Amino acid sequence: MDHYKSNISEVKKETVQVNGSKGAYIQWLITRENGAHYAVRKFTVEPSGIIPMHTHKYQETVVITKGKCKLCVANRVYEMKDNDYVFIDGDIKHAILNHDERLEFFCIIDYAGNMEIQATGEEC
C-alpha cells in the first residue's frame, strides 16, 4: 500500500489494556496493516484517569494535544501540557496520570519483536 487516508472519528476506540488502567482509551490509526514500520495511536484519558506504571520493549514518542497530566518516566516526574512531547526508550518504566480535564495525546511506536506490555505495580 503506497498510502492510507482516514479520519480519527472512523477508528474504533478501545479500552487501554494495561492492568490497572482507568478511563483510558486507544485508537490505532496507522499500523503494520497499513504497510507502516511503526504505529500511530491516539489516546483519550478521562478526568482522573490513569495508565499505570508499565514497561515494554518498543520505543515511543508521546505528544500531548489536549489537557494536562503527570507523566512518570523512570524516576522522573513531569507535568505535561498541550504541545509537550517526550521520547521514551524501550524497557523504561512509565505512567500517565490525568488531572481534572479530558486528556488527548498521540503516541508513535516502533514494532519491537516482543510487543507485550508489563504492568510493574509501582506507584508514579
Which residue stretches match the model-derived regions?
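Short acidic-glycine-tyrosine-enriched beta hairpin
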Residues: 75-90
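Asparagine-centered strand-capping/turn motif at beta-strand->loop junctions
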Residues: 97-99
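Conserved short histidine dyad/triad with adjacent acidic residue
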Residues: 26, 40-56
